[in-house]
Amino acid sequence: LITVFVAALVTAGMAGATAVPLASLVSEHATGLVYAKAGPGGPTRSEADAARWIRDNSKPGDLVATNAHCMIQRGKTCDSRHFWIAALSERPVLVEGWSYTNKANRDSITTGVNPSLLPFWDTQRLATNDAAFTSPSAAVVESLHRYGVRWLFADNRAGEISPNLKQYFRLRYATLDATIYEFR
């Protein structure tokens, strides 16, 4: 009987120790964050279809760039636990969410800041990546090419998408929420 009681006590303690920190990660009151757009943190059906289209029409090592990085955003603070494009496309992404990276977790230990709320450490890469979607130019396209990007996943819910993308990339697939482009 004592063994059962101790086991139950340990289990309850472990559950509580896990739940309390997790609550601070997701509580918008604890972080002051709000959802960037109304809706779930995951993809819409059409976004998921677009990611699967990339999976079905590309090679496993093809690199994807996307403008979607934050599950939740307020001002310059980004909850960077966004990873479903890489997950559903089964392709590497130049910059998507970075919360689950070794670098973010190491930086979290040294700074005491939640890894989900740390800014992306390679500001030049992020700026180049995002410029491809907001203000594409020959220089930006060349930079993406040097990184090895083959595909663009333009998520309409993540922000404005420049109509000039079609000058540099070939439109391959479009849904209500996402458009897929390929390097020409």
Q: Can you annotate each of these PLM segments?
A:
Residues 2-184:
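Extracytoplasmic
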